[in-house]
UniProtKB/Swiss-Prot annotation:
Keywords: Cell membrane, Membrane, Plasmid, Transmembrane, Transmembrane helix. It comes from Sinorhizobium fredii (strain NBRC 101917 / NGR234). It is found in: Cell membrane. InterPro entries: Small_drug/metabolite_transptr (IPR000390), Small_multidrug_res (IPR045324). The chain crosses the membrane at residues 3-23, 40-60, 66-86, 94-114. This is Uncharacterized protein y4nH. It holds the Pfam family Multi_Drug_Res. Disulfide bonds: none annotated. It comes from the Bacteria.
Length: 117
C-alpha cells in the first residue's frame, strides 16, 4: 500500500489539532463577557479556520486512494491523540492515566485500520 495517503491523513489530523488549539487560544484571549461575534475577529479564530481548510484539502486528496471508512477514523483518532497532548502542553489541561490509556488505545486502533485498509 502507498504510504502517501496515510501521511496526508495524519497531516490533516495535525492541521485539525492546530486549528482547535488556535480556536481555544483565540477564545481564551477574550474577556469572559465577550460575545460570540467577537470571536470571529480574533487571530486565533482566523488561524483556526485556515488550518481547518488545509485539513479538508489534505483529507480530500487522501480520499482519492483510501476508503473513507478507513481514512476518517485515522483522521479523527490521530487528531484526537495530538490534541490531548497539545492541550496539556499549551493550556495545562490535565493528562491523567485514563487519558494516556485512551490515547494508547486510539493509536492501536489507528495502526489496525492503517494496516487493514
Amino acid at each position: 500500500m502507498n504510504a502517501v495517503p496515510i501521511i496526508l491523513v495524519f497531516a490533516a489530523g495535525l492541521n485539525s489539532c492546530i486549528g482547535n488549539i488556535l480556536l481555544k487560544w483565540g477564545r481564551a484571549s477574550l474577556p469572559p463577557s465577550a460575545g460570540l461575534a467577537d470571536t470571529f475577529l480574533t487571530p486565533g479564530f482566523v488561524g483556526g479556520v485556515v488550518f481547518y481548510g488545509i485539513n479538508v484539502l489534505l483529507f480530500a486528496k487522501a480520499l482519492d486512494s483510501l476508503e473513507v471508512s478507513v481514512a476518517y477514523p485515522i483522521l479523527a483518532g490521530s487528531g484526537f491523540a495530538m490534541l490531548i497532548i497539545a492541550s496539556h502542553y499549551f493550556f495545562g489541561e490535565p493528562f491523567h492515566l485514563h487519558k494516556w490509556i485512551g490515547v494508547a488505545l486510539v493509536l492501536v486502533g489507528i495502526i489496525f485500520l492503517a494496516r487493514g485498509g
